[in-house]
Amino acid sequence: MPDATLPACFLSLLAFTSACYFQNCPRGGKRAMSDLELRQCLPCGPGGKGRCFGPSICCGDELGCFVGTAEALRCQEENYLPSPCQSGQKPCGSGGRCAAAGICCNDESCVTEPECREGVGFPRRVRANDRSNATLLDGPSGALLLRLVQLAGAPEPAEPAQPGVY
């Protein structure tokens, strides 16, 4: 009987510690995650001007959003970092954050969102000397383009994003 107590104690100890022993848990255990401060997510996209919103979503104020494209490949690295991150200016939709002008993203998809249109962090104009592929749209042409984008996205508000540029 004494020969069986040592293995039984060892197995009991292993059962209690296996929750964070076999999984990649942070220092302090899973409950310590709420104590950590959120960091800014990794930069991504052309020139590192965007921020990751999920493993396949890269968005920036001047870029728009890249979903499932080569520009968003760097965002897969977020899965391997131990600390949580947060991108975006303000909360929107169901658990999302404003990612670009008029776009709300969570870690799985992006949708058009009126409350993300204009405000802090989403400039209406792009600097003329900026070498990005953005165009200067202000006035009637910009309003028309924004309205067309809203009409195109209105029927499918919760449809998951497909690979492409938004």
From Swiss-Prot:
Signal peptide from the UniProt entry: 1-19
GO cellular component: extracellular space; secretory granule
Keywords from the named record: Amidation, Cleavage on pair of basic residues, Disulfide bond, Glycoprotein, Hormone, Secreted, Signal, Vasoactive, Vasoconstrictor
Outcome recorded upon mutating residue 120 to I: In 30% of the molecules
Site (Important for agonist activity on V1aR/AVPR1A): 28
Ribonucleoprotein among keywords: no
Main localization (coarse): secreted
Cellular localisation: Secreted
GO molecular function ontology, one term from the record: neuropeptide hormone activity
Record-linked InterPro entries: Neurhyp_horm (IPR000981), Neurhyp_horm_dom_sf (IPR036387), Neurohypophysial_hormone_CS (IPR022423)
Pfam families reported in the protein's UniProt record: Hormone_4, Hormone_5
Disulfide links within the chain: 20-25, 41-85, 44-58, 52-75, 59-65, 92-104, 98-116, 105-110
Stretches that traverse the bilayer: none
Residues with glycosylation annotation: 133
Residue list for modification Glycine amide: 28
Entry's Gene Ontology BP terms: vasoconstriction
Quaternary structure note: Interacts with vasopressin receptors V1bR/AVPR1B (Ki=85 pM), V1aR/AVPR1A (Ki=0.6 nM) and V2R/AVPR2 (Ki=4.9 nM). Interacts with oxytocin receptor (OXTR) (Ki=110 nM).
Protein role: Neurophysin 2 specifically binds vasopressin.
Misc note: Fetal neurophysin is the major neurophysin present in the neurohypophysis of 7 to 9 month fetuses and its sequence appears to be identical with that of the adult.
Similarity section: Belongs to the vasopressin/oxytocin family.
Protein name: Vasopressin-neurophysin 2-copeptin
Species the sequence originates in: Bos taurus (Bovine)
